């Protein structure tokens, strides 16, 4: 405002010295000086708007300086994460989010072995619980973000006789994730609760061979993560497979959902996220990592998750 006042007074003084029109209300009101004042005002307003835009803040009022945040996320989050990152960068353009996607068990092991990571977004609570027990997470940053459902799928155009878990033994081949992979663990849980597999203290320890035997010796393609299962079925390499419902997003013309497995067979398929205790991260990186985890709980993020077939009704 001070700059604006000085500019207007200077304009008025110049107008008087040139014997132009008289002043009004203590300022020069000639059309020429008014036009110039309006131009100055518009320029000032534009400058202030640009300044305000560059200072656009998050909920806690902070815009971060340039920093990079590494996110380890379950393979089933690959597609939705691209949209989440894009949305987050609308308010935090200086934060570069780098995603690394694999099975939650593999990512957990990498964190335990000292891999540089700022945020862990798991497809199951088990891996998050283990890291929390090892004090590898920042206290108070863990949140349950979304729920998902296991599906039995086949490729579009297949003549499979399989309708769901109950008759998986009719398949010529099955793509199935290893028990250490959340979707593989949930599938085994469902098969136990459906009476197809025998009960076990730790269902994730049930081997692929044991699953095959319980299904009458059907051929099983053991996959390292849910993405590999999705690809194997979509490409027709295996007749059926078990994936998450969210994994069918964008593949509606290639995958056919035979059964959405009910929660009473699998239990809730909760995806938790938390900030990792990364000793290599500076203060800005740590603050941005925490902020991104909080963003994942926002209404904006929830809308994106729902578009990708995730359930946002979680406790």
Regions found by a protein language model. Name each.
Residues 23-26, 32, 36-38, 42-86, ...:
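Exported/periplasmic ABC-transporter solute-binding proteins
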Residues 135, 139-143:
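Central helical "cap/lid" subdomain
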Residues 1-10:
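Positively charged n-region of N-terminal signal peptides that target proteins for export
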Residues 99-109, 116-132:
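Ligand-binding clamshell of periplasmic/extracellular solute-binding protein-like
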């Amino acid at each position: 405002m001070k700059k604006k006042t000085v500019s207007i007074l200077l304009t008025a003084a110049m107008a008087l010295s040139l014997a132009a029109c008289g002043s009004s209300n203590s300022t020069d009101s000639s059309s020429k000086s008014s036009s110039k004042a309006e131009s100055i005002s518009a320029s000032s307003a534009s400058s202030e708007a640009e300044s305000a835009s560059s200072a656009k803040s998050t909920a806690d009022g902070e815009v971060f300086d340039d920093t990079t945040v590494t996110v380890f996320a379950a393979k089933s989050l690959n597609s939705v994460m691209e949209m989440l990152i894009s949305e987050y960068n609308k308010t935090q353009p200086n934060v570069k989010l780098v995603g690394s996607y694999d099975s939650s068990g593999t990512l957990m092991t990498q964190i335990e072995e000292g891999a540089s990571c700022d945020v862990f977004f798991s497809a199951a609570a088990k891996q998050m619980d283990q890291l929390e027990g090892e004090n590898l997470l920042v206290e108070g940053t863990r949140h349950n973000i979304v729920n998902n459902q296991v599906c039995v799928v086949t490729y579009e155009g297949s003549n499979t006789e399989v309708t769901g878990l109950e008759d998986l033994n009719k398949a010529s081949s099955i793509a199935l994730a290893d028990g250490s992979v959340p979707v593989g663990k949930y599938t085994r849980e469902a098969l136990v609760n459906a009476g197809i597999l025998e009960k076990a203290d730790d269902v994730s320890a049930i081997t692929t061979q044991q699953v095959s035997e319980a299904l009458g010796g059907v051929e099983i393609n053991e996959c390292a993560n849910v993405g590999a299962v999705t690809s194997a079925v979509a490409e027709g390499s295996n007749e059926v497979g078990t994936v998450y419902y969210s994994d069918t997003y964008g593949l509606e013309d290639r995958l056919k959902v035979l059964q959405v497995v009910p929660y009473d067979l699998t239990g809730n398929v909760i995806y938790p996220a938390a900030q990792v205790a990364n000793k290599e991260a500076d203060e800005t990186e740590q603050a941005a990592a925490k902020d991104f985890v909080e963003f994942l709980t926002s209404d904006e993020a929830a809308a994106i998750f729902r578009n990708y077939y995730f359930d946002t009704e979680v406790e």
